[in-house]
């Protein structure tokens, strides 16, 4: 067992107890800072310290499982401390504070921190600037405006003078379409930190954001946090809730840290995914606690227009020690992934009653740049996940999702619009109380899934399981207690894969190439 520092900021820091367990330790542990007890019973492997002083050395000590682990660290330096209350904030939850909060953010000197004290501050869109920190104190709530006309509209595409180049400022479900600016926007900046124990509350349930959500009204819905074309961005500690649509949506961001924070959206709030990195690189999602009504974490890379034009994949991602609760999918790839998704490692995550666990969704039309490869899922626990492992290359999304082109089960020509799935590795995973299917792998006949490798995987079905759709595709029957279904897969390797409580044949294969099991 080891204690490690994930990241230190000016007034906060986040740590990880390296115990090999999924999200939670075997027993609660105590945390001390410079000899003073901070937590008497910490129940997560990742924990944070707040209200620290900048440029100050500290010693943190953890007492866990009979061991005492200590670690010295120093907070980052800070140039200036900007108390946003001095800008005339009114913390009554009603008064519009947008201009005052933006003034504090815009005038903060380089290397400074904007501090928002406890209180409820109604606001619309805010924009961060480079080399600054936003610190939300415990009890501070930035409360989203309920009137959509108060939000700026961001153009999806900005043309250049040469009428050839284009700049993509925002997007909606993988296309560069005009959208409202988010509650918090991190656009064309670098070295930005948002931290603290406060809350971004979009308050979408009290507006019209979730009504007729598929209809564009003025512009497409905003995100809670929208980051575009930025570098070295960190979100830490805060709670983000009641989002208008996707909660945290970074596009073209390099070096992104999402650490030890909470996302809470109602189970029936439409399209309120937790985290949707789109064509981002070098991502760390560690210690997230996500409760949503759609996908918890969905890795994306645009639809075919941007994907094939820019060829920007979502790559080099680490997801660790996260709780993924009640969503449609725990860890999801796609379906907007025309730029490709590569080199992702998921470890020590706990999925609790999501519809699907590890889920890949794509379809014809995403393009030959839509390559998914190098995905590793290791040391993951699933509880009550209806379909733990799903790969679906017939996903029925978009207006043409039910068309013969997308749903035809016969082989079609491999062309520039055919996606590809490479290697997926799943190891040391326990799934209990599954319902629909343990493994459901459905590749394209003309472009089969390259390789699926499973090692030390245990799946147990709920005795009272109900039938349902393992994958969202046409002409697929509802299934119940289906062990392993695979169609159009070049290679499947199963090593110490144990499935109990299933019905019918254990293996239901069609057009599977090399198969190995021990």
Where do the language-model regions lie?
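Extracellular/periplasmic carbohydrate-active domains that bind, remodel
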Residues: 1-518
């Amino acid at each position: 067992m080891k204690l490690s520092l994930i990241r230190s900021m000016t007034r906060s820091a986040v740590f990880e107890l390296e115990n090999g367990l999924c999200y939670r330790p075997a027993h609660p542990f105590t945390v001390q800072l410079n000899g003073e007890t901070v937590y008497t019973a910490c129940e997560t492997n990742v924990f944070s310290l707040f209200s620290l002083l900048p440029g100050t050395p500290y010693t943190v000590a953890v007492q866990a499982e009979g061991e005492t682990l200590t670690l010295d660290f120093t907070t980052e330096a800070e140039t200036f401390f900007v108390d946003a209350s001095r800008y005339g904030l009114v913390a009554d939850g009603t008064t519009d504070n947008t201009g005052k909060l933006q003034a504090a953010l815009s005038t903060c000197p380089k290397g400074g921190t904007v501090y928002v004290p406890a209180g409820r501050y109604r606001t619309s869109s805010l924009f961060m600037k480079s080399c600054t920190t936003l610190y939300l104190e415990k009890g501070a709530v930035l409360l989203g405006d309920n009137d959509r006309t108060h939000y700026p509209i961001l153009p999806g595409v900005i043309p250049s003078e040469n009428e050839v180049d284009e700049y993509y400022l925002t997007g909606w479900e993988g296309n560069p379409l005009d959208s409202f600016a988010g509650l918090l926007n991190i656009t064309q900046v670098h070295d930005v930190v948002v931290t603290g124990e406060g809350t971004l509350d979009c308050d979408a349930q009290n507006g019209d954001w979730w009504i007729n959500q598929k209809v564009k009204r003025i512009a497409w819905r905003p995100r809670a946090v929208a980051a575009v074309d930025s570098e070295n961005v960190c979100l830490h500690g805060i709670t983000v809730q009641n989002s208008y649509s996707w909660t945290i949506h970074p596009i073209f961001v390099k070096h992104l840290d999402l650490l030890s924070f909470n996302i809470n959206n109602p189970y029936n709030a439409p399209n309120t995914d937790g985290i949707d990195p789109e064509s981002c690189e070098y991502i760390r999602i560690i210690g997230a606690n996500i409760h949503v009504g759609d996908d918890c974490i969905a890795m994306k890379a645009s639809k075919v227009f941007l994907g094939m034009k820019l060829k920007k994949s979502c790559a080099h991602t680490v997801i660790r020690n996260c709780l993924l609760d009640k969503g449609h999918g725990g860890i999801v790839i796609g379906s907007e992934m025309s730029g490709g998704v590569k080199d992702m490692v998921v470890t020590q995550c706990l999925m609790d009653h999501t519809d699907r666990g590890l889920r890949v969704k794509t379809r014809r039309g995403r393009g030959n740049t839509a390559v998914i490869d190098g995905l590793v899922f290791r040391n993951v626990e699933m509880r009550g996940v209806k379909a733990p492992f799903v790969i679906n290359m017939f996903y029925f999304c978009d207006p043409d999702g039910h068309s013969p082109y997308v749903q035809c089960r016969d082989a079609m020509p491999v062309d520039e619009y055919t996606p590809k799935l490479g290697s997926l590795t799943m190891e040391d995973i326990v799934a209990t109380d599954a319902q629909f299917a343990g493994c459901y792998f459905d590749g394209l006949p003309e472009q089969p899934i390259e390789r699926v490798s499973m090692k030390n995987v245990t799946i147990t079905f709920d005795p009272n399981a109900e039938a349902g759709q393992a994958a969202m595709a046409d002409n697929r029957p509802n299934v119940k207690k289906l062990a392993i279904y695979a169609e159009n897969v070049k290679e499947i390797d199963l090593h110490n894969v144990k499935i109990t409580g299933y019905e019918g044949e254990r293996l239901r294969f069609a057009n599977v190439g090399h198969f190995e099991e021990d």
